[in-house]
Amino acid sequence: MLMPKKNRIAIYELLFKEGVMVAKKDVHMPKHPELADKNVPNLHVMKAMQSLKSRGYVKEQFAWRHFYWYLTNEGIQYLRDYLHLPPEIVPATLRRSRPETGRPRPKGLEGERPARLTRGEADRDTYRRSAVPPGADKKAEAGAGSATEFQFRGGFGRGRGQPPQ
């Protein structure tokens, strides 16, 4: 499909930066949501990715009216050559995630529970504690209970049933 070179470059840059591309299957959508600032139609994204897929540079998944494209190793090399990028720049999918550099937590509170529980958590905690006392026999308590005489009645609206005895 004929499309402006600036659109193709914008699509390839986003694909290389993220490593993945998502597009809704809607050829009439005026702009792709992630490339709205560059005025790239969704149709151009779909066709550019279809072209890369046919050459084996991306893998395609489709679910719930959305296309998902993942860069392959050959695709990374192709986009590096096409966009004239150095080998140090890699897609976000290949970068290692850093551990969170937040404030270290005090080590004294690891085994303790929080002092204040919400109502739902307190109810759940009480139920778990009082459900079965330690050392109790679960199998002896299971079953129909102490009633030895059972009475079977017909269901509601399923025939006439027997008269009560």
From Swiss-Prot:
Residues 97-128 have a biased composition (Basic and acidic residues). It is found in: Cytoplasm; Nucleus, Nucleolus. It holds the Pfam family S10_plectin. InterPro entries: Plectin_eS10_N, Ribosomal_eS10, WH-like_DNA-bd_sf. The modification Phosphotyrosine is found at residue 12. Methylated by PRMT5. Methylation is necessary for its interaction with NPS1, its localization in the granular component (GC) region of the nucleolus, for the proper assembly of ribosomes, protein synthesis and optimal cell proliferation. Keywords: Cytoplasm, Diamond-Blackfan anemia, Isopeptide bond, Methylation, Nucleus, Phosphoprotein, Ribonucleoprotein, Ribosomal protein, Ubl conjugation. One of its GO terms (molecular function) is structural constituent of ribosome. The keyword Magnesium does not apply. The modification Omega-N-methylarginine is found at residue 153. Changing residue 160 to K: Weakly methylated. It is linked to Diamond-Blackfan anemia 9: A form of Diamond-Blackfan anemia, a congenital non-regenerative hypoplastic anemia that usually presents early in infancy. Diamond-Blackfan anemia is characterized by a moderate to severe macrocytic anemia, erythroblastopenia, and an increased risk of malignancy. 30 to 40% of Diamond-Blackfan anemia patients present with short stature and congenital anomalies, the most frequent being craniofacial (Pierre-Robin syndrome and cleft palate), thumb and urogenital anomalies. Component of the 40S ribosomal subunit. The ribosome is a large ribonucleoprotein complex responsible for the synthesis of proteins in the cell. This is Small ribosomal subunit protein eS10. It comes from Homo sapiens. The lineage of its organism: Eukaryota, Metazoa, Chordata, Craniata, Vertebrata. The gene is RPS10.
